[in-house]
Curated annotation (Swiss-Prot):
Disulfide bonds: none annotated. Keywords: Oxidoreductase, Pyruvate, Thiamine pyrophosphate. The pyruvate dehydrogenase complex catalyzes the overall conversion of pyruvate to acetyl-CoA and CO(2). It contains multiple copies of three enzymatic components: pyruvate dehydrogenase (E1), dihydrolipoamide acetyltransferase (E2) and lipoamide dehydrogenase (E3). One of its GO terms (molecular function) is pyruvate dehydrogenase (acetyl-transferring) activity. CDD domains: TPP_PYR_E1-PDHc-beta_like. Gene3D superfamilies: 3.40.50.920, 3.40.50.970. Pfam families: Transket_pyr, Transketolase_C. Thiamine diphosphate binds at E60. InterPro entries: THDP-binding, Transketo_C/PFOR_II, Transketolase-like_Pyr-bd, Transketolase_C. It comes from Staphylococcus aureus (strain Mu50 / ATCC 700699). This is Pyruvate dehydrogenase E1 component subunit beta.
Amino acid sequence: MAQMTMVQAINDALKTELKNDQDVLIFGEDVGVNGGVFRVTEGLQKEFGEDRVFDTPLAESGIGGLAMGLAVEGFRPVMEVQFLGFVFEVFDAIAGQIARTRFRSGGTKTAPVTIRSPFGGGVHTPELHADNLEGILAQSPGLKVVIPSGPYDAKGLLISSIRSNDPVVYLEHMKLYRSFREEVPEEEYTIDIGKANVKKEGNDISIITYGAMVQESMKAAEELEKDGYSVEVIDLRTVQPIDVDTIVASVEKTGRAVVVQEAQRQAGVGAAVVAELSERAILSLEAPIGRVAAADTIYPFTQAENVWLPNKNDIIEKAKETLEF
C-alpha cells in the first residue's frame, strides 16, 4: 500500500496497463513530452517510448478518429481530451462512431477505447475547461461513463476501463487531483464498472452523489449526524450504467433521498437517478426526493464559480428539508 494522490493513482494505473498489454497506447495533446497539463502521464513516454505514449496535434476530432482506427485494428487506445469542455470537437467520433462500433458491426468488431478527460469546478479555470458534461455522454448509447471520487477508485476503475472491450469515458475531476491522499495498493486491482459504493451507512436518509460532490456530501453527513440524523452516502462511481439496485435498496431502508450533482440541474445524471427511484422505490418514500445541483446557466469561469457550485451547506439545507417533511 502507498499513500497516493489521484494524479499518482491514475499514473500508476496507466503504467500498469502499459506493462501488461503491448496493445495499450496513450495519446493526446501534451501527454507525451510534458506528461499532460496536470502531469498525469508524467514519465510514461520516457519509460515506454514514443511509439506507445505520444503527443498529437491540437485537433480533438483527429484524436478521436485515430482512436477509432486503432481500436478496430486491435489496439487499446487511451485518448485524452485535454478538457471536457472541448469534447464537442470530437463528439461525433466518440458518440457517432466509437460508441456504435459493436452495434454497427453486428458484434463482429469492438472499440476498446478509453476516453480520459479532466473536468469540474473549484479550481477557477477559464471558460470551457470545467464544464460538467457527463449527462450528455451518459445519454449516448454504447458508452460507459466512470467518475472516480478519490485515488483508490481512480486506479481500480481506470484499469477496468482500459480492459473493457467497449468504450469507456473516464472523467477526472480537477479539484480532486491533488486535494487529498488515500491508501492505494501498489499491485494491480480492478473495480467493477457499474457498481456503486456505499461510502457511509445510515438509516434516516440516503445522499446519492458522485465525483467531487462525494466529499461535500460526506462533510454534510458529519454535520447532520451532530443533529442526531443517521445519514447514508452512496458514491455512484459510474453514471452510465447507474447501479439502480444499490440506490433502490438504500432508499427502501431510509425512506428519504437527496440526489447531489455538481452539474446543472436540467436533464442530468441526478434527474436519471430521481426517475429510477420514482419508478422503483416510490412506495418506500416518506418525502419528496430532494435535489442539489448547479443553476441552469452556462458554467461560470474563474472566481464566479464560487457562488455557483453546490456545497455542503446546500446539501445540509436540502437534507433537513427532506428529513422534516
